[in-house]
């Protein structure tokens, strides 16, 4: 781990909070640590209880730290697409160096120039996506660094989000004792792992089925064109099963994962299991076919909502088909049901990395890949703060019985250039979030 970059992602979801520790070796990602805990304080992707959310973040961080003996101090944070809006942008700068060679500094300046636009006071910039760079009129350039020119332009997309939504999410991360290296819109991260470049160019819909919500993202011409969030996810299936089987939500979740099938026509009547009845000592017998009827009804409703959302957005031609990801996309039969509803090609995206080969980790892994790619373009390093430190930590062992203000831990030793490069940048973006 000596000279390689260690990056940590934090994916805050409704049903689970995931932490991935990745080691970048010659631009290749190795997963060396994973934290995955049930989340509290999140509903439909938004923070509803700061103390519960902070506690869940700390537990996930601890779990990942124990795997590798690493002291996690900074993270790449995924921001849900709730209330996200995409705006076209354009920036132009003169190349600053005397020899007219374009550097990372010029790329930063042209990105900053592209952000000079009128944004409502209740919104904040989350990401700036470069569609193409133009050097002295020559377009379709992905990376202009090292080229010679006088005039550098960038055409791109600015992603803005609700200032309040961002405030609450980032405040939880800060109160968990973590610094924020980078923030990334979750669909951008998911697309980095789930979609091939051909799929992004053709026109493909990425459907990320989370616990409390489902994110729909449309990619075409190499970049994201549209994103929206539906307030339905895997937790709704669990609640449906809980009601239908008259059992607890915990039991219903276990049954969904172990015996669930999304396509009624292919479900088995022979797969029988016992279900404890809530409030009594009795057990009822059910088979997979019976619960499949419940699951299929909810997922079919969700997929029809996806179709309607795309129709209202004016998206009709989808030559790249549909790609499913997120925890609920691992269910048996979901491909058959999706193909039946969408009448198009459908596949499930799974991260191809040891230890995280499940669709629920797509966003968390994608956060590292996306942030690393962007940091390279601007010459930034993201990993200065995380260090090997196998020291027992007391700060996150017990949850206090009484809710109280949690002071950020482990900030007493600032690193060289940290205020300027990382936290300073975040302060400029989200000034009033970090008031002392």
Protein language model annotation of sequence segments:
Residues 1-16, 20-75, 79-204, 247-250, ...:
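Nucleotide/phosphate-binding catalytic cleft detector across ATP-hydrolyzing
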Residues 9-10, 19, 77, 173, ...:
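Residue-level signature of catalytic and energy-coupling elements of molecular machines
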Residues 10-16, 79-80, 206-213, 219-222, ...:
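A short acidic Gly-Thr/Ser loop motif
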Residues 16, 80, 161, 263, ...:
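Glycine-rich phosphate-binding loops at beta-strand->alpha-helix junctions
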Residues 152-153, 220-223, 314-321:
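Short, surface-exposed connector motifs at secondary-structure boundaries
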Residues 231-248:
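A conserved active-site cap/scaffold subdomain adjacent to cofactor or substrate pockets
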Residues 308-320, 331-346:
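ATP-binding/phosphotransfer module of carbohydrate and carboxylate kinases, centering on a glycine-rich
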Residues 347, 351-392:
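Glycine-rich phosphate-binding/hydrolytic loop that grips phosphoryl groups
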């Amino acid at each position: 781990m000596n000279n390689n970059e260690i990056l940590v992602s934090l994916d805050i979801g409704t049903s689970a909070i995931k932490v991935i520790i990745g080691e970048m070796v010659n631009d290749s990602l190795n997963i060396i640590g994973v934290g995955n805990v049930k989340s509290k304080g999140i509903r439909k992707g938004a923070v509803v209880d700061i103390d519960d959310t902070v506690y869940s973040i700390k537990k996930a961080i601890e779990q990942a730290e124990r795997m590798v003996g690493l002291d996690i101090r900074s993270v790449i944070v995924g921001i849900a697409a709730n209330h996200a809006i995409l705006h076209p942008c354009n920036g132009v700068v003169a190349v600053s160096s005397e020899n007219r060679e374009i550097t990372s500094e010029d790329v930063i300046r042209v990105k900053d120039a592209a952000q000079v636009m009128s944004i409502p006071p209740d919104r904040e910039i989350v990401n700036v996506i470069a569609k193409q760079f133009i050097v002295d009129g020559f377009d379709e350039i992905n990376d202009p660094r090292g080229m010679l020119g006088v005039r550098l332009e960038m055409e791109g997309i600015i992603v803005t989000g609700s200032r309040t939504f961002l405030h609450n999410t980032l405040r939880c991360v800060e109160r968990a004792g973590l610094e924020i290296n980078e923030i990334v819109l979750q669909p951008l991260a998911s697309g980095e792992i789930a979609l091939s470049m051909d799929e992004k160019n053709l026109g493909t819909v990425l459907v990320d089925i989370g616990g409390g919500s489902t994110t729909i993202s449309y990619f075409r011409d190499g970049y994201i064109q549209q994103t929206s969030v539906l307030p339905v996810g895997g937790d709704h299936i669990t609640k449906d099963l809980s009601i239908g089987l008259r059992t607890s939500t915990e039991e219903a979740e276990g049954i969904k994962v172990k015996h669930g099938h999304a396509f009624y026509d292919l479900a088995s009547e022979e797969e029988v299991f016992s279900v404890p009845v809530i409030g009594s000592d009795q057990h009822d017998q059910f088979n997979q076919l019976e619960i499949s009827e419940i699951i299929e009804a909810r997922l079919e409703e969700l997929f029809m909502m996806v179709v309607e959302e795309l129709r209202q957005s004016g998206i009709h031609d989808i030559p790249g088909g549909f790609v499913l990801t997120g925890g609920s996309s691992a269910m048996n039969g979901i491909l058959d049901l999706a193909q039946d509803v969408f009448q198009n090609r459908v596949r499930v995206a799974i991260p191809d990395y040891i230890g995280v080969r499940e669709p629920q980790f797509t966003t968390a892994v994608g956060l590292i890949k996306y942030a690393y790619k962007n940091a390279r373009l601007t010459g930034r390093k993201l990993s200065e703060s995380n260090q090997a430190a196998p020291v027992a930590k007391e700060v996150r062992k017990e949850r206090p019985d009484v809710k109280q203000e949690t002071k950020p831990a482990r900030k007493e030793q600032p690193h060289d250039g940290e205020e300027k490069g990382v936290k300073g940048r975040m302060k400029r973006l989200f000034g009033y979030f970090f008031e002392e």
